[in-house]
Amino acid sequence: MDWNRVEGNWKQVKGKVKEQWGKLTDDDLDQISGSREQLEGKIQERYGIEKDRVRRDIDDWYGRQTWNW
């Protein structure tokens, strides 16, 4: 997984993140600014999911995406 590409294209990616994790606010997404660690933390906070599960969910989500870099 090349998370650096996600960080570098965050403005385009955050819409897909919002579709998957709708409880994240626009302010959350702006604050995350592409940081995987911050995304994990916000998902944990909003959904009450343990860290290992959040990591797996993000990996699964990332693998399902069609990226047009």
From Swiss-Prot:
Top-level taxon of the source organism: Bacteria
Matches recorded under InterPro entries: CsbD, UPF0337_stress_rsp, YjbJ, YjbJ_sf
Pfam families found in the cross-reference section: CsbD
Alphabetical keyword list: Plasmid
Sequence intervals crossing the membrane: none
Protein family: Belongs to the UPF0337 (CsbD) family.
Name this protein carries in UniProt: UPF0337 protein RB0906
